[in-house]
């Protein structure tokens, strides 16, 4: 089998995994039907995991296959996590905010919402660190959003190592693809490497 055939096979398997996740989520979250139909899927060598620009879910095939094999709930959560990023316009709303803190705030907001659902296909035991952060967020924010979390974290004067520790806890997807929105006018810039339809 040549390299082209291998890539096509990996692409087929990756697409099947993401479609399976989408179908499973849809069964229990029909209220998100429109959002579930919004993504296309593409292999990417720009990430070692998964990520979205709002149009595509990009994935490293070996990473996705291994995650699916060992922890389907993680794949479901990652899919939902990226949907929430897009629904709440996280990729395009940074607007001068400090990137690392904005990325963390978006991840906390998305995970906070996911952890509020009782659906077994996404439920996971929470770590002590996650519970600690949620306690701080819930005690200080009435309606959790990335913007509110960002204001809270900014006001806390966190050291870089604290931000890194929280980021390690809440990071699910790669935000590298959000760079299509990083320009002065905030116009959507389609990436040069956009896969064909």
Tell where the protein language model's regions lie, with residue ranges.
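Short, functionally important secondary-structure microenvironments
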Residues: 1-76, 83-197
């Amino acid at each position: 089998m040549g390299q082209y055939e291998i890539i096509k096979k990996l692409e087929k398997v990756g697409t099947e995994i993401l479609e399976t996740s989408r179908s499973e989520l849809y069964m229990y979250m029909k209220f998100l039907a429109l959002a579930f139909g919004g993504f296309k899927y593409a292999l990417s060598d720009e990430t070692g995991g998964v990520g979205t620009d709002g149009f595509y879910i990009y994935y490293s095939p070996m990473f996705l296959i291994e995650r699916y094999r060992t922890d389907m709930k993680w794949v479901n959560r990652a899919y939902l996590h990226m949907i929430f990023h897009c629904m709440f316009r996280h990729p395009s709303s940074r607007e001068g905010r400090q990137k690392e803190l904005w990325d963390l705030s978006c991840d906390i907001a998305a995970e906070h919402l996911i952890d509020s659902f009782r659906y077994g296909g996404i439920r996971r035991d929470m770590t002590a660190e996650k519970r600690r952060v949620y306690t701080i967020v819930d005690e200080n924010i009435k309606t959790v959003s990335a913007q509110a979390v960002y204001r809270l974290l900014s006001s806390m004067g966190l050291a870089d190592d604290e931000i890194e520790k929280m980021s390690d806890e809440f990071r699910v997807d790669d935000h590298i693809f959000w760079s299509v929105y990083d320009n002065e006018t905030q116009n959507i810039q389609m990436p040069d490497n956009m896969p064909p339809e």
